[in-house]
Amino acid sequence: MAQRLTSAFLNWREHITPASKTSDFENTGMISPEEFVLAGDYLVSKFPTWSWECGDRIRGFLPKDKQYLVTRHVFCVQRNINIGVNEEWVDIETDDTRNKDDDQDDDAISSIHSDTSDIASAERLKGQSKELSDSGPLPLKDEEDDDQMVSPVIKEDEGRYYDLYIVYDKYYRTPRLFLRGWNAGGQLLTMKDIYEDVSGEHAGKTVTMEPFPHYHSHNTMASVHPCKHASVLLKLIKQHRERNDPIRVDQYMVLFLKFVSTMLPYFEIDYTIQA
């Protein structure tokens, strides 16, 4: 019950927060609704699998035809692991805890820049999903394996597919990710299933079931709480600037996807672009 009340309060707080009209993403890691649209347009132009949608609940601070971004049928390799988390609810950040764990921001940065085993595994499997539905199980070979060891076979019923949604959060002034998944048989995934596809650092910490703000009904989805988004993205923006490779505000969404991919290492999320 406490988790439900906390979630309801946070959603109410976001609802009553006025939309920002200022621009200061280089110093805050946050963006305005206008910059959200600008960055979304850039994402759609560079990655045609993403598109704008309006839903059936229009939020007045965004253009009617550009309410949120969506990409569908994103392949995810199913992991056979156990995560000790509640079936429906996990911990989320509140104002009392938001400022006490900057070390987690550094961990997120390290996750983005390091070649973790999760991401390495996902990269070896990337590109295979498009053939699954046509050819069935595929044997995969590890290109870096000099000992010619055979990697596990991905069976058709082991793959999962997700629709990913990016909305604008008025309170945190950042994008927010929602996701809904199905197994290969078309059955909707439970929260426990979804936790299996989230990195161990994030599963059971910042992922909750939340109402999707652009649907009136049947709108509950898994969502990554955005309380840390701005601080992590700001550090990435500063790192690019220090390397004389500054990030423009229209490229912000690509950087956001790079950050998101560390939480979802088994998802085929493409953010590699010479922007």
From Swiss-Prot:
> Which residue stretches belong to region Handle region?
231-251
Pfam families per UniProt: Autophagy_act_C
Task: Summarize where a 1,2-diacylglycero-3-phosphoethanolamine binds, as residue positions.
Answer: 1-10
Assigned protein family:
Belongs to the ATG3 family.
Instruction: Give an example GO biological process.
Output: autophagy of mitochondrion
Summary of the function given for this chain in its UniProt record: E2 conjugating enzyme required for the cytoplasm to vacuole transport (Cvt) and autophagy. Required for selective autophagic degradation of the nucleus (nucleophagy) as well as for mitophagy which contributes to regulate mitochondrial quantity and quality by eliminating the mitochondria to a basal level to fulfill cellular energy requirements and preventing excess ROS production. Responsible for the E2-like covalent binding of phosphatidylethanolamine to the C-terminal Gly of atg8.
Show the active-site residues: 227
* Compartments reported by the entry: Cytoplasm; Nucleus
UniProt protein name = Autophagy-related protein 3
Which controlled-vocabulary keywords does the entry list? Autophagy, Cytoplasm, Nucleus, Protein transport, Transport, Ubl conjugation pathway
Q: Which superkingdom does the taxonomy of this entry point to?
A: Eukaryota
Q: Where is this region: Flexible region?
A: 83-156
Comment, domains: The N-terminal region is involved in phosphatidylethanolamine-binding and is required for atg8-PE conjugation.
